[in-house]
Amino acid sequence: MSYDWEKMRKEEWPVLETMTFLDAACVSFAPQRAVRAVKEFADMTARQDEANSSAHHIALDDMRHKAYAEAQKLLNADPEEIALIESTSHGLNIAAQGIQLEDGDNIITTNLEFIQVALPWCVMRKEKNIDIRVCKPEDERFTVESFAALADERTKIIVMSTIEWCNGWQTDLKALGNFCKEKGIMLVVDAVQQLGVTKIDTKECHIDLLAAGGHKWLNSPYGTGVLYVNKESLSKIKQSYAGYLNTTVPEGGWGAYWENPAAPSVNNWTFPETARKYEIGGTSNYAGAVALGESLGLVNEIGIENIEARVRQLATYCMDRIEEIGGTVITHRDPGHFGGIVIARLYDDLDVDRMILKKLHARKIFIAQRFTDYVGGFRISCQYFNNEKDIDTMIEGMKDLIQEIGREPD
């Protein structure tokens, strides 16, 4: 299916006419449809069209519902498997607090993670004698065998990023999920660098819990993200929060309940056995959820298969162009194992590359520089709203600076 990428870019991201933006792996821009939805929500908060304040609150809450439906569609999940969260950090903490570990248990993560991935379990080590085992890649590639080599009968969780932020490697989730299911290990994933980029089918991949903030590749404003919890895992992950809005709604609704003179302040509340029980259950970030619903809707409207093909085409073009000017590409081109992140270097001297980065920014060419455990370099994000011209502009800027430095890349 062909798609008019340039038309979409002009209609949804007019800001891209003012700069060369290749940094969606850090933060991205909201499309105009999300901006309009937030403005509509803000207008609703300035008036009341409903019969009373309780009905008004419910109407505002209902505006979040599109985000659930669109996330469910994108992940090929069931309705009871989707919740909305504040961020990836929020979702990972739900996993850490909810999956019970005992002294002597271990979890496995990798050496290339963003610090938040293992952080909740690092804190847990202060109270429990748990072991955090760190998987290191072979030639910067993580495989099932990489994780299996560290696993034993006390391994309870594998927690990792589906696409690594500092080398762009996309792990085979289906294979890793099958391994975890066979061994009785919980698979917890940070999908913030993959969701909205390449396909994640939760019916094919045995993932227990997935968390992804919306402000990167989903192009949503800050403060809202997606939580997926496999329905087979709902009983295995303890509920962290108890808010009245994630209890079972009383007969007649909350408005009728509050008007009941006999309503008790203490009750034996029940919670639906769905992923929404992990939400905080209070007044939430409605505006963020409204925007997230629109941004997810755009991804589904285009089609994740189309986006995946587009992003990988741009990433491949980017890698080719960097190599043309003598740069070194760190990201592997293995089919199915890269998304929109391209990691590259021009010089072995990091100070020189930092200077290049600063001068590119001065030209309004926005990329990043990221490292973990000595792996990394320039991080160039090829989002579906980008085009070859963006990459060419970056390359021309790099060529000018190489000439200014006076020596070829290392």
Question: Which stretches of residues belong to each language-model region?
Answer:
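Pyridoxal 5′-phosphate
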Residues: 1-410
